[in-house]
């Protein structure tokens, strides 16, 4: 399975591509940063990011696209640009019928290091170790994109979009999801919802 990970950003959008083989064996394929010029207008910046993402998707033909979930940041302009870039990645994948998954930074840290509060350097070292890289992936956006792809390989059920979730779950994950749904329904009945 080829997984394309995206660390969304309006100035720098990290893209990492890995292959998940049998027995969770992960292999490095590609890492890059799609850039836009902060001096140009917003629409042209978005177009540059979109075109770069489309080029990567068409070049590597991933089976899944995994995107870092946008969360609130103090700088409103930063979160807006990040959300727009994430939307472009979702659009580019959806137009090609590729399943999209969203993973939080905490999920990614937990899947890769076992610690949801791992420092960036710990993440970079583990990404390099997992993928057998001799050097740490740089810049940080590139390392984060690889981390998101690895997270999806290790935790494929993470917030899949477009109703594709069930086909990517293991039997145990399906049973857990069904039990969780039943428990939620029972709680809803007890609360009179």
From Swiss-Prot:
Pfam families from the UniProt entry: RuvC (PF02075)
Subcellular location: Cytoplasm
Keywords: Cytoplasm, DNA damage, DNA recombination, DNA repair, DNA-binding, Endonuclease, Hydrolase, Magnesium, Metal-binding, Nuclease
Cofactor note: Binds 2 Mg(2+) ion per subunit.
Active-site feature positions: 7, 68, 141
Annotated EC: 3.1.21.10
Binding site for Mg(2+) 2: 68
GO biological process: DNA recombination; DNA repair
Annotated positions binding Mg(2+) 1: 7, 141
GO terms for MF: crossover junction DNA endonuclease activity; DNA binding; magnesium ion binding
Keyword Hydrolase: yes
Domain of life of the native organism: Bacteria
Gene Ontology cellular component terms for the protein in this record: cytoplasm; Holliday junction resolvase complex
Enzyme class of the recorded protein, top EC level: hydrolase
Reported cofactor(s): Mg(2+)
InterPro entries in the record: RNaseH-like_sf, RNaseH_sf, X-over_junc_endoDNase_Mg_BS, X-over_junc_endoDNase_RuvC
Major site of localization recorded for this protein: cytoplasm
Catalytic activity: Endonucleolytic cleavage at a junction such as a reciprocal single-stranded crossover between two homologous DNA duplexes (Holliday junction)
Biological function: The RuvA-RuvB-RuvC complex processes Holliday junction (HJ) DNA during genetic recombination and DNA repair. Endonuclease that resolves HJ intermediates. Cleaves cruciform DNA by making single-stranded nicks across the HJ at symmetrical positions within the homologous arms, yielding a 5'-phosphate and a 3'-hydroxyl group; requires a central core of homology in the junction. The consensus cleavage sequence is 5'-(A/T)TT(C/G)-3'. Cleavage occurs on the 3'-side of the TT dinucleotide at the point of strand exchange.
UniProt cross-references to NCBIfam families, sorted A to Z: ruvC (TIGR00228)
UniProt subunit comment: Homodimer which binds Holliday junction (HJ) DNA. The HJ becomes 2-fold symmetrical on binding to RuvC with unstacked arms; it has a different conformation from HJ DNA in complex with RuvA. In the full resolvosome a probable DNA-RuvA(4)-RuvB(12)-RuvC(2) complex forms which resolves the HJ.
HAMAP family xref list: RuvC
Similarity annotation: Belongs to the RuvC family.
Protein name: Crossover junction endodeoxyribonuclease RuvC
Species of provenance: Bifidobacterium adolescentis (strain ATCC 15703 / DSM 20083 / NCTC 11814 / E194a)
Lineage: Bacteria, Bacillati, Actinomycetota, Actinomycetes, Bifidobacteriales
């Amino acid at each position: 399975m080829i997984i394309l990970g995206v660390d969304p950003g309006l100035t720098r959008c990290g893209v990492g591509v890995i292959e998940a083989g049998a027995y969770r064996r992960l292999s490095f394929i590609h890492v890059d940063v799609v850039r836009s010029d902060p001096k140009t207008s917003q629409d042209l910046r978005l177009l540059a990011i979109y075109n770069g993402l489309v080029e990567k998707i068409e070049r590597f033909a991933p089976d899944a696209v995994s995107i870092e979930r946008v969360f609130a940041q103090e700088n409103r302009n930063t979160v807006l640009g990040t959300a727009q870039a994430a939307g472009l990645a979702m659009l580019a994948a959806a137009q090609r019928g590729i399943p999209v998954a969203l993973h939080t930074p905490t999920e990614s840290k937990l899947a890769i290091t076992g610690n949801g509060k791992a420092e960036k350097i710990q993440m970079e070292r583990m990404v390099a170790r997992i993928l057998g890289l001799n050097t740490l992936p740089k810049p940080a956006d590139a390392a984060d994109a690889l981390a998101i792809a690895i997270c999806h390989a290790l935790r494929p059920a993470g917030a899949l979009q477009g109703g594709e979730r069930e086909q990517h779950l293991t039997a145990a994950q399906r049973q857990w999801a069904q039990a969780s749904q039943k428990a939620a329904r029972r709680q809803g009945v007890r609360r009179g919802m």
